Structure formats: structure tokens, C-alpha cells
Amino acid sequence: MALRVQFENNDDIGVFTKLTNTYCLVAIGGSETFYSAFEAELGDTIPVVHANVGGCRIIGRLTVGNRNGLLVPNSTTDEELQHLRNSLPDAVKIYRVEERLSALGNVIACNDYVALVHPDLDKETEEIIADVLKVEVFRQTIADNSLVGSYAVLSNQGGMVHPKTSIQDQDELSSLLQVPLVAGTVNRGSEVLAAGMVVNDWLSFVGMNTTATEISVIESVFKLNQAQPATVTTKLRAALIEDMS
């Protein structure tokens, strides 16, 4: 299922939100309606946490995470870091990264297994991504754009990339990521996919301007119509237990 929401009359909901299979971050200061939309859908399954990073609300663009971890920029204060550590599941590793390209959400796209990163990302940051998020890392561009985190959205079920991504590039990326990919838009034609939507393995939230056609493409490629949180979390728990044993 893909649900339409707005953050204070802004359709770029992916700028103010970070959604994974084990937690959801929502910027402090949004309307209560925005927060409650996430709480209503996710509250029984994963924690929905109010958070800011470096005093900024654009947490979706500044952070990157998956079920294993969360990377935050160097501008994150000690208090903000402590709040995240107190609020997220113990199994989620939180790490503050010293990286020149500090809008981590713009330069990294990931699911629970692989990450696409900006070609100029520090080597040390690449190693941190692999270690904390437990993913295989690939330096990549999307439709000749280095901001892979802005122009690609991934889950473990599928992915969506910039509408100008060639078929050949889609095929290469798909085999690299091992998930089906589609080129598409959100918010009535916006190419900046990650600004307009967030997705995990059973649910997506999109900007209010997103058309019915865009929603049906999103639900199809991310396999949201057949996904149930209960089955997903059961699988995740089994995987986590397996990891720990």
C-alpha cells in the first residue's frame, strides 16, 4: 500500500522522513496529522521517532539507514545522537560519520543488502557503510547523476530510479542490486524520487501530489500489494536471530 501525506503543505515528504524495516524517523515540528499518519500505519510494528539532526528537520536528506543501522552526519549533536540511541531498537547500530558530502541521504541509496553511493564518497565512509549497514557497496551514477540517494529509492523487494535512466542501465543496476527496477516519477512528474517518497518492504508514503498512475507503479515494483508487516517482521526476527547465533 502507498499512502499520500504532506509535511506542512510540502509534498517532499522524503526530505523530512526516514523509513526502514525496523524504525521510522519523522522530523520534529511537522503537523500532528503528518506524524499520526505514520504512527497509525507503523506504530504496532516499528518505533516511529521524532528526531532532528544538527538542529535541522531535513532528516531524510541528512541520514541513511536500513534495518541494521543508521548513519548520521557530523553535524548531529551529542543530545540528538543519545535521543536516537534511546529510541531505536538495540540491534540498530547508530554511527556519526565525518564525510565532506554530509547530506548522506542524497549521496547513498540502500536497502538491507546493497548500497549505491556517490562516486566521490570518501573511502573511509564506504567502509563505514559496509560495516554499520552490513551491505555491499557500489560506486554508481543514476542517469549520469552522482546524487544516487536522490534519484534512486530501494527496498528489498524492488527499486525505482530516475525516469531518464536507460534500459541498459536499469538492467545493469537490477542485476547488481538483485531486485527488479523501474524508471519512474513521484509527485506528478518529479524526478527527485527520494524527496517525494519513502518505502520499506510492506508500505510506502508518497507526497500528496502523487498521481494514481505513479502510485500503481510504486505498489507494483515494490510489491506492496502482497506485503504484510506481520510476515515481514517475522522474517526479519528470524534473520536477526540467525545473525546473532
UniProtKB/Swiss-Prot annotation:
InterPro entries: eIF6. GO terms for biological process: assembly of large subunit precursor of preribosome; cytosolic ribosome assembly; maturation of 5.8S rRNA; maturation of LSU-rRNA; ribosomal subunit export from nucleus; translational initiation. One of its GO terms (cellular component) is cytosol. Its main location: cytoplasm. It is found in: Cytoplasm; Nucleus, Nucleolus. CDD domains: IF6 (cd00527). Monomer. Associates with the 60S ribosomal subunit. Binds to the 60S ribosomal subunit and prevents its association with the 40S ribosomal subunit to form the 80S initiation complex in the cytoplasm. May also be involved in ribosome biogenesis. This is Eukaryotic translation initiation factor 6. It comes from Drosophila melanogaster (Fruit fly). The gene is eIF6.
